[in-house]
Amino acid sequence: MTRAILLVLDSFGIGNAPDAAAFGDAGADTLGHIAHHRAASGRPLALPHLASLGLYHAHHLATGEWAEGITPPETLDGAYAAAAEISSGKDTPSGHWEIAGVPALFEWGYFPDKTQSFPPDLLEALIEQAKLPGVLGNCHASGMPILETLGEAHIASGKPIVYTSADSVFQIAAHETHFGLDRLYALCEIARELLMPYNIGRVIARPFVGETPETFERTGNRRDYAIEPPTPTVLQKLHDDGGKVLGVGKIGDIYAHCGVSNVIKAHGHDALFDATLEALDEAGDRTLVMTNFVDFDTLYGHRRDPDGYAEALEAFDRRLPEVLAKLRPDDLLILTADHGNDPTWTGTDHTREQVPVLASGAGLAPRPLGHDDGHLVTFADIGQSLATHFGLSPMAHGSDFLDVAPTGPSSHASTTGD
């Protein structure tokens, strides 16, 4: 029986990418800086199960250093690598598409102006078609600060809050009760169509509740309106070949529901874990279970909260054995990330980083993966390896790491003297 489980720790980078300087991210290191922050506070980061799968070894490949305050295990239970991205952006669709074997090699559209960010013609069309009294925001912003600033004005005026960031994104925040959730979704669908000529990757509905800046809170009813991948992903190929793809969390939205057989919605990491375990119980032969753990990014990366990020990682690590216990002998488990979001970095945007690839099962020996002592060429090696695992035709990008021979019995030993 052939199954695969792909867990995406959204934004969990492990050191700046080779081209990070072009993005203003030279020196970014989500894992390394979280570990440093915790070590400096006398509470070393504790991720024993991720460590046993090769997390710290992957970080060592990416940076040449061991994360501060950790002791890498001398023996491992998984294969590991550090993967770099060739897609043009450092956003969620680019990372996920490339993970699925389809890198975004084109340039996304962006709204670079920090204020008055959107073209007047676009906003006028949105206001007219959606019959709005106007809009608020029209700027670069992070989600909670803009609610604290404009939430009360939104409730009083009925004008939705529109904003963007360094990503290719158009976000709309509106109150679930005062504006209406269905109305927000309908507004986002209008915006999605209007934004097609601008080549914007995502429109995101950001519903919230509360009555004052102190009580405003975003809800779990977020919805992403993405464009379709330009060519079939490994998800689409598996689906078209008679297999099944169970997308947990926002996976369906990220891929514009292309190739996703069933969508299992859940909000919060514990609920996402529960849904993943239920999906594994349901998954039969030739099934891919794919989950995005989004809170690392939205709650801790963008909000520059290294303590919260560390605690979320430790909570994830504590639950990881529940997934491991459900694996069958031929299952392939892969843990990775779609980009970085260093919570100690300047600003509030993603960071261009390498990501871990931690793989277990399917006959993989504990070792570095890939072609250069563990460094994968692209995120797309994951998609290519999944294609091989499921017996699909090859992807146009990436190399299969399942067939690479081990580099020797000592290849996964730790060298703590580095």
Curated annotation (Swiss-Prot):
Keywords: Cytoplasm, Isomerase, Manganese, Metal-binding. It is found in: Cytoplasm. SUPFAM superfamilies: Alkaline phosphatase-like (SSF53649), DeoB insert domain-like (SSF143856). It is an enzyme of class 5 (isomerase). One of its GO terms (molecular function) is magnesium ion binding. Its main location: cytoplasm. Binds 2 manganese ions. Mn(2+) 2 binds at residues 297, 302, 350. It catalyses: 2-deoxy-alpha-D-ribose 1-phosphate = 2-deoxy-D-ribose 5-phosphate; alpha-D-ribose 1-phosphate = D-ribose 5-phosphate. One of its GO terms (cellular component) is cytosol. Its EC number is 5.4.2.7. Pfam families: Metalloenzyme. GO terms for biological process: 2-deoxyribose 1-phosphate catabolic process; 5-phosphoribose 1-diphosphate biosynthetic process; metabolic compound salvage; nucleotide metabolic process. Its cofactor is Mn(2+). InterPro entries: Alkaline_phosphatase_core_sf (IPR017850), DeoB (IPR010045), Metalloenzyme (IPR006124), Phosphopentomutase_DeoB_cap_sf (IPR024052). Pathway: Carbohydrate degradation; 2-deoxy-D-ribose 1-phosphate degradation; D-glyceraldehyde 3-phosphate and acetaldehyde from 2-deoxy-alpha-D-ribose 1-phosphate: step 1/2. Mn(2+) 1 binds at residues 10, 338-339. Belongs to the phosphopentomutase family. NCBIfam families: deoB (TIGR01696), PRK05362.1 (NF003766). Isomerase that catalyzes the conversion of deoxy-ribose 1-phosphate (dRib-1-P) and ribose 1-phosphate (Rib-1-P) to deoxy-ribose 5-phosphate (dRib-5-P) and ribose 5-phosphate (Rib-5-P), respectively. This is Phosphopentomutase.
